[in-house]
């Protein structure tokens, strides 16, 4: 009997009440846009910063007793596949807006399943034609016929709110803003950024936006005047739980061998999508100056990450033009999640002189793994690194060279950066991130009742 009473008391603690004593507030029904989470099926640049934010925020949402989470994606078949094949999502519910959607999702799921199992070419072609037709009908249906019921909140970690939700004034909308890069660099003609400019068009003064840094918030206030600055709330991002400092040299060497990194070489590490704003040619040039000036023949520069197709030829051409020195530059491509910590932990330092960041997750990853960081003093990066590394002007060769020499030769300073970086990285957690989001949603929904 006593155990039963204790259980009742414990459960009552988790039941939210409003201002009237004893009146239980019902759970908030959240429709979560998991479109980008579906990139879990890919191993390329599609699984980069925004994907990991959407993925980890969703996992944290699913832990919260205050919410009923329903998933939505542009391609419901991918959601069906993920829920059936990824254990972390096995209890998730897909929001059903019509019987026709069930048919679409089943067909889309079968197409994915057939692709992943490498079935016959003509079978793939059949599924491709069928899904193209059904996607068209599904798009028409969502645009003109769907009425969303029993949803309190629509949460998007990336994309614009779809029209079938947008016109429902009863649903409160919340969107994460990641950066203003396409606005600043004017990517309007780039088809890959069509989703981004759809988002910009949809921004208004009523919905709530979560910015991943103070820098991102300020950029949206500057470049999107119609946004209400009071409706932008800054949230701290984090990394995957697998990012830790690894001391097992044998394991580190095993991972290095997997990516073709010579075991007898020290290496400086850079991990990012290989695109122009990451300032990689600047990094390569100054790395070579560093090793030549200091006669460090046993050093190489390891570049990890998927490459933009438009930039790949430019980067490769610059590396080829190095002549004999090109052997000091090693591109290892996309790095599997489980290998990240070992590669960070095995390096001498991390270079990230990016010209623009919305947040800068790789810097935080390096800090968590005990790797000292040299990064830009621009945009959001000072918010992440604090005083735990060296911040430089990303256009200054002199500052970059001096920073590399300081980090490598001053071992006391290096150890101080490692210790401070690990401590500071503990400030950034997905729990803190979603706590901010949850408090705002609960205040808006329950506070209005």
Provide a role label for each language-model segment.
Residues 3-5, 10-12, 18-449:
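Carbohydrate transferase catalytic cores enriched for Leloir-type hexosyltransferases
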């Amino acid at each position: 009997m006593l155990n039963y009473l204790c259980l009742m008391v414990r459960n009552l603690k988790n039941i939210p009440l409003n201002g009237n004593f004893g009146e239980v507030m019902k759970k908030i029904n959240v429709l979560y846009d998991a479109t980008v989470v579906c990139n879990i099926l890919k191993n390329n640049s599609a699984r980069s910063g925004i994907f990991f934010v959407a993925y980890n925020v969703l996992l944290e949402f699913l832990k919260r007793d205050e919410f009923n989470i329903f998933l939505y994606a542009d391609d419901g078949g991918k959601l069906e596949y993920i829920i059936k094949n990824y254990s972390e999502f096995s209890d998730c519910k897909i929001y059903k807006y019509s019987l026709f959607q069930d048919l679409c999702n089943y067909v889309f799921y079968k197409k994915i399943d057939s692709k992943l199992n490498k079935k016959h070419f003509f079978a793939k072609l059949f599924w491709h034609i069928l899904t193209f037709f059904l996607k068209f009908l599904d798009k028409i249906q969502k645009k003109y016929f769907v009425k969303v019921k029993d949803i309190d909140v629509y949460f998007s970690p990336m994309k614009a709110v779809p029209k079938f939700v947008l016109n429902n004034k009863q649903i409160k909308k919340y969107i994460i803003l990641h950066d203003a890069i396409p606005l600043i660099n004017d990517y309007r003609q780039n088809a890959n950024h069509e989703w981004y400019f759809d988002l910009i068009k949809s921004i208004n003064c009523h919905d709530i936006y979560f910015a991943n840094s103070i820098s991102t918030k300020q950029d949206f206030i500057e470049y999107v005047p119609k946004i209400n600055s009071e409706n932008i709330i800054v949230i701290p991002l984090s990394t995957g739980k697998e990012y830790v400092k690894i001391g097992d040299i044998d394991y580190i060497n095993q991972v290095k061998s997997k990516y073709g990194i010579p075991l007898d070489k020290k290496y400086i590490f850079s991990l990012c999508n290989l695109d122009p704003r990451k300032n990689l040619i600047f990094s390569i040039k100054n790395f070579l100056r560093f090793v030549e000036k200091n006669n460090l023949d046993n050093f190489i520069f390891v570049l990890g990450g998927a490459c933009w197709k438009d930039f790949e030829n430019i980067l490769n051409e610059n590396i080829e033009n190095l002549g004999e020195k090109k052997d000091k530059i090693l591109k290892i491509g996309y790095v599997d999640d489980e290998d990240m910590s070992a590669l960070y932990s095995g390096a001498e330092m991390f270079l990230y002189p990016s010209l623009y960041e919305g947040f800068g997750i790789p810097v935080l990853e390096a800090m968590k793994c005990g790797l000292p960081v040299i990064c830009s003093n621009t945009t959001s990066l000072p918010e992440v690194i604090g005083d735990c590394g060296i911040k430089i002007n990303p256009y200054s060769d002199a500052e970059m060279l001096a920073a590399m020499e300081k980090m490598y030769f001053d071992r006391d300073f290096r150890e101080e950066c490692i210790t401070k970086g690990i401590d500071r990285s503990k400030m950034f957690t997905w729990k803190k991130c979603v706590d901010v989001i949850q408090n705002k949603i609960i205040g808006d929904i329950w506070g209005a009742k």
